[in-house]
Amino acid sequence: MNHRHRKLLHALFSHPLPTNLDRHDVETLLGEIGATIDRTSHGRLMIKHEGHSVSLHASERELSKDDVVHLKKFVEACGINPERDFPI
């Protein structure tokens, strides 16, 4: 995982929640950690990793705060800790 992806993963867990996360960058990050990403016919992204799944809006360029919260919970449920697994 390159430095840009690590910074993005750490930003996901920062406080306050970031509102400028680019959807394409997040898709690339999730691909790096081994998640599978499928586009549904309803304009959503279905992300699956280690038996966990989350659905995000795919139509917007940046993720909404709700999507960021769902994504953060998904990453935590998958057992990924950015401080431990991917230090900057």
Residue ranges and their predicted role:
Residues 1-88:
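Basic nucleic-acid-binding interfaces
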